[in-house]
Amino acid sequence: MLRRLVGPLGSGATSALSRGSLRRVSTTPASLKRFPPKQGLYDAALEKDSCGVGMVASLKAEPSHKIVADANTMLVRMSHRGGCGSEPNSGDGAGILTGVPDAFLRRIQPGLPAAGEYGVGNLFFPNNPEAVAKCKAIFEKHIDELGLQLVAWRTLPVDNSALGPTSLESEPAIEQLLVAGRPGAMSGRELNRELWRLRILASAEVRADAAMEDFYVCSLHTGTVVYKGQLTPEQVWGYFLDLQQPDYMSHLALVHSRFSTNTFPSWSRAQPFRALCHNGEINTLRGNKNQMRSREASLVSAALGDSLANLLPITSNDMSDSGNFDAVAELLIHAGDRQIHEAVMMMVPEAWQNKDMPPDR
């Protein structure tokens, strides 16, 4: 079996990880990398899903590696909630969202700004060096245009030796991006809004090239980071070597085991998404997306002003129902200057037997 080494963790890493990560070379036909067209009984517009979710958190917001490890145990125990095809080692998707592991990142990237003054994100790239370089150049251009500062790119260390043929064939190159705001001028909510704009603007330019359809930003935020992929729940911990490090600590962890049913599995459709993860089906998806598109012309944001128009459309046919829900939630959070619980309550209001609900309710 052929392997090649990629993705060192840096001079401060453990000896095993500093040698890089094991990555197999795929021999599966390239046709397995693409979403299938409408054919026979398959129609992407009729896709549905049902998944498993779980969360571990410290009520005192104290980060620890135990929370991350316990979340992995929870994820593995939800294997029955996930799915796979004829290959038991090619999953429908699984992942984990944690707080930004500041101590871990400082060990491998000395000189980071203070916590909350930099954002971190994991990005999927087409698996060839030329495409990776092109995507990075586009991101760096938008970083400069938004007045942000590039801290570092880091090849994410992974071990793909346990992946099945289908997952392996569609496996992306994965890079971690560290971005800071203007020194002393941007942090917290304002910086997260700019990171959201950066992700949307750069992603739109990258994906305008049909050859870049595998490009995807898992997350880009000052407070959370997402590790996910077309994996089984059992594969997440072994695939992402970062998660195994004792100083990878978090005050919370959100995990998701995906059951695709009719939804075609992919690395990007795995969850958690950037703001949330979702279990179930949105049966009114097409109507929801149509109504969202119809409202875009009248959207106004005091926080973004005229720049909001450059971030549209919000929803996409490439995303699952959960992915579109996540995108609209982010719009309400960043452009609407709302907290996440407010955004979710607006999108899924509580049941009420009368025609109108009192504003104070």
Predicted regions and their residues:
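Conserved short alpha-helical segments that host acidic/polar catalytic motifs at enzyme active sites
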Residues: 2, 19-361
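N-terminal chloroplast transit peptides
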Residues: 1-17
